[in-house]
């Protein structure tokens, strides 16, 4: 790695969020981070608690640190909390999107890959696959769609529908972490 590369890597690692999380009030913190994990404020609440008891609270002021801590909170949560986290996610190109009921983040993510501009046939295909997936796994198909194409999303559905429930549960949690990472990077 070159010296320039080392400085770039250091700068990335040391990226300070717009408002230092360790210096925010609880209300400010929740406003900024509650939506990182879709409709799962408990993740940000637990992170806030960790920051408050930390001797070195400024260690939580980088994107990488916040991301790692939030991921750790989710990974150590019990099964029921993780299942609720998965079920908090909307269907891709689903009825909530049509009704305008998505969070701003989900709306932006789905629109960014054209899921708001599907043909009637594509929409029906998404509905069928969403329904089949939920019938088998009891949570919605979750994929970090940023940068993906509709074809890649359809392929993701098709390649994952044959997974075991345990394998797909773990895959879905990992996709949620990717989504959270994208959301944090945008802060």
Give a label for each model feature:
Residues 42-43, 145:
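Conserved phosphate/anionic-ligand binding catalytic regions in large, soluble enzymes, centered on
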Residues 118-187:
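C-terminal non-catalytic interaction appendages of large macromolecular assemblies
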Residues 6, 43-129, 179-187:
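Aromatic-anchored, charged helix-turn/loop surface patch used as a conserved interaction hotspot
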Residues 3-35:
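Charged, compositionally biased N-terminal leader segments and the immediate start
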Residues 34-36, 75-76:
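Short secondary-structure boundary/capping segments within folded domains
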Residues 25, 77-78, 164:
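Residues that cap or delimit alpha-helices
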Residues 21-26, 38-39, 60-65, 133-135, ...:
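Short acidic alpha-helix initiation/capping motifs at coil-to-helix transition points
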Residues 40, 47, 141:
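Residue-level signal for inorganic ion chemistry
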């Amino acid at each position: 790695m070159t010296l320039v590369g080392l400085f770039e890597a250091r700068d990335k690692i040391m990226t300070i969020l717009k408002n230092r999380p360790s210096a925010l009030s609880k209300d400010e913190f929740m406003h900024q981070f509650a939506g990182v994990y879709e409709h799962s404020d408990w993740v940000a609440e637990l992170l806030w608690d960790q920051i408050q008891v930390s001797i070195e609270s400024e260690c939580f002021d980088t994107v990488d640190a916040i991301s790692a801590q939030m991921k750790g909170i989710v990974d150590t949560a019990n099964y029921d909390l993780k299942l609720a986290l998965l079920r908090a996610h909307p269907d891709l190109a689903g009825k909530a999107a049509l009704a305008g009921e998505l969070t701003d983040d989900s709306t932006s993510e789905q629109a960014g890959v054209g899921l708001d501009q599907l043909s009637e046939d594509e929409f029906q295909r998404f509905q069928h696959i969403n329904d089949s997936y939920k019938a088998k796994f009891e949570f919605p198909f979750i994929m970090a769609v940023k940068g993906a194409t509709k074809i890649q999303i359809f392929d993701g559905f098709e390649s994952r529908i044959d997974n075991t429930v345990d394998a797909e549960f773990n895959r879905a949690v990992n996709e949620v972490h990717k989504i959270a990472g994208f959301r944090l990077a945008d802060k």
